[in-house]
Structures are given as C-alpha cells and as structure tokens.
Design a protein with these regions (language model features):
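Extracellular beta-strand-rich, repetitive "passenger/adhesive" scaffolds
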Residues: 1-190, 196-269
Length: 269
C-alpha cells in the first residue's frame, strides 16, 4: 500500500552477509513497501496492524518470518530456500496470478496465522521441524487458516515430506512430484479438486497413522509410485475418480470409496 518504502533498491548493490533484515512498524502511520532485486538471507516482518507489499521478487537464502502484520507479494516472485513461519495474527498473501510459481522450503502456519497460497503453483521443495518432530514440509496448526486460492500445492523435495493440516482449510489441487522418498500425511487431509501422485516407483504416499484419512473430491491420478505402502490407510477414505497410468494402490483394511476407476497400467492390491 501507498508510496512509502522501508527499503527501495533500484539497482544498487545489496549484500545480505548471511544476516537478518527486520522490517518493523517503528515510525509507520500506514502500510509500506519493499523493493530489493537482490537476495536477502533471513527476513522478519513485524508490522503490528500494518501491511507491506513487495515491488520486486522476494528471494531469501534463509528463512522468512512474519510475526505481525500482513505481507503481500504484489504479484512478484516469492522464493524462500528454508522455512516460512507465520505467527499468531499475521498473514501472508501470495498472488492471484495464474502463471507464477512461488517456492518455499517449508511452511509453518502457527495458531492464529493465515496463509493464502498462489492461484497457480505454490511449491514446497524442502522440509522443516514439525510439531510431531517429523520433517513437515507444510504444517497448519490448529487455529490457523490455510486458503488454497484455487491453486496447486506441489511437493518436490528429494527427502521425506510430511503434511500436517490441523487448522482450517484444505488443498484445491495437490501434486506430489518427487524423485525420491515418501510423502507422509498427518491428521485428515481434504483435496477439493485433484490429487496427483508422481513419485519414484519404490516410494509412497502414506499416512502417519493408519486411522488418518484422505478425501479427494475430484480425481486421484497415479502416474508413478504407490499409495499405502509401509503404513496403510485403514480408515474410511474417499478417492473420487481413480485414474492409474502406472504405480501401485495398496488398499487398507478400511473403506475405500471411488466414484470410478480407470486402470491403464497400474496395480491395485
């Protein structure tokens, strides 16, 4: 908002020196802006009741923390190598662009925090320490809000990635596109549209506990990889329309509901 800038770099040299840059509300009377074509290392946003908008790509080689206020990407890039954290009362709004991809190492939305995903693709390519001690690529705590913005959340790390959706909100499209290791879902995960599985052939989507459930309201696509290996889905699960190009679907001992099944080369066991 407005024309005031807390940092305006229009082509000068900015060296992060592996330090943290803090943007706070000291002296602010309204919202402000940030423009920096260079990379930050760590960034903290502490704006109280105010907001800030990026006027260039936000790139961090470390972490991005919003303790208070609202950060909006202004339809510019958002690429954070490590953990993004949103504290109680704080908000991150990624853009409504239908062509951009935003990249986060991992995301923790604490109770009272709000995250709005990108309308196109929000990619998670790392993992962080979850409340259960597992490497949570995405953790939405109880009391937090996750707004899918009708976009796709894509998980791509070569390591294990945990998904913990304990707050309000569900995925729209969820894509698991990994060359190695598993995806572990905690609690009960809902996908408003489509779930796409594209994992290494010997790796799997699995629950943290056999009682955890999945609800897909559109289509479950299995391009490669497995569902339900190592730990089975033994509760009542709804997979929508199942389309298998390859891969393996291992049915648990519970109830698996399908709207339709089209198996073009996979295995159901």
């Amino acid at each position: 908002g407005g024309t005031d800038f807390m940092l305006y770099n229009d082509g000068g040299t900015f060296t992060h020196n592996s330090g943290k840059v803090l943007f706070d509300d000291a002296g602010l009377s309204n919202g402000s802006n940030i423009r920096n074509p260079s990379s930050f290392h760590d960034v903290e946003i502490a704006l109280g009741s105010f907001s800030c908008t990026a006027h260039h790509n936000m790139t961090c080689t470390g972490t991005f923390l919003v303790t208070s206020g609202t950060y909006s990407d202004g339809s510019n890039g958002f690429h954070i190598d490590e953990l993004v954290t949103i504290k109680n009362g704080a908000t991150i709004n990624l853009s409504n662009s239908t062509t951009q991809t935003k990249k986060l190492g991992a995301l923790l939305v604490e109770s009272g925090g709000t995250f709005r995903a990108c309308r196109n693709i929000t990619e998670f390519d790392g993992s962080g320490a979850g409340h259960s001690g597992q490497p949570s690529a995405l953790e939405v705590e109880s009391g937090a809000t996750f707004n899918n913005n009708l976009g796709t959340c894509k998980f791509t790390s070569a390591g294990d990635q945990d998904i913990e959706m304990d707050g309000t909100g569900m995925f729209y499209n969820l894509e698991l596109a990994k060359t190695n290791n598993d995806v572990v879902m905690h609690a009960n995960v809902e996908v408003e549209n489509n779930l796409t599985i594209d994992l290494a052939a010997d790796h799997t989507l699995r629950p943290a506990s056999t009682s955890n459930t999945v609800t897909v309201r559109g289509t479950t696509f299995i391009k490669e990889g497995k569902i339900g290996d190592t730990t089975a889905y033994n509760g009542t699960n709804n997979w929508g329309n199942l389309v298998m190009k390859s891969g393996t679907f291992i049915l648990g001992s519970g109830t698996n509901n399908f709207e339709s099944i089209r198996n073009k080369g996979g295995t159901i066991s």
